[in-house]
């Protein structure tokens, strides 16, 4: 199953795993609240949180880059991070991975 979450976000679910891509779910928007999701999608954030909490599947979240409309740290902090494996591209600087490591997830690669 593939579900569009708005903006650049997708949820992909198989029999064994769940993969989230660039989940931007915060009600506060991004860039000092000058950008908002259209249409609004923050109500899906609770659904995703429930899926993560209730599943025994392996969970991966892919963060494509550090812009706040792709790397929604306030929302990520609301998730059960000890169950989540984060995947990031190799960047010249390690800002995304560094922030993710501080959240104490299951893994960051």
What are these regions (language model features)?
Residues 6-8, 82:
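Residues that flank catalytic or metal-binding motifs in active/ligand-binding sites
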Residues 8-11, 26-28, 66-71, 93-96:
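Active-site environment of divalent metal-dependent phosphoester hydrolases
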Residues 17-62, 73-78:
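Pre-active-site segment of Zn-dependent metallo-hydrolases
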Residues 84-109:
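Metallo-beta-lactamase
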Residues 1-3:
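Extreme N-terminal starter segment of soluble prokaryotic enzymes
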Residues 12-16:
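Active-site beta-strand termini and strand-to-loop segments that position acidic
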Residues 58-61, 83-87:
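Hydrophobic beta-strand segments of well-ordered beta-sheets in folded domains
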């Amino acid at each position: 199953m593939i579900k569009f979450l708005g903006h650049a976000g997708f949820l992909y679910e198989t029999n064994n795993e769940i993969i989230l891509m660039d989940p931007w779910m915060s009600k506060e928007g991004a860039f000092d609240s000058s950008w908002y999701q259209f249409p609004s999608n923050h109500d899906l954030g609770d659904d995703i949180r429930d899926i993560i909490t209730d599943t025994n599947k392996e969970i991966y979240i892919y963060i494509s880059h550090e812009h706040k409309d792709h790397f929604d740290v306030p929302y990520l902090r609301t998730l059960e991070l000890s169950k989540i494996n984060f995947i990031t591209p190799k960047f010249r600087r390690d800002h995304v991975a560094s922030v993710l490591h501080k959240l104490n997830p299951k893994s960051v690669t």
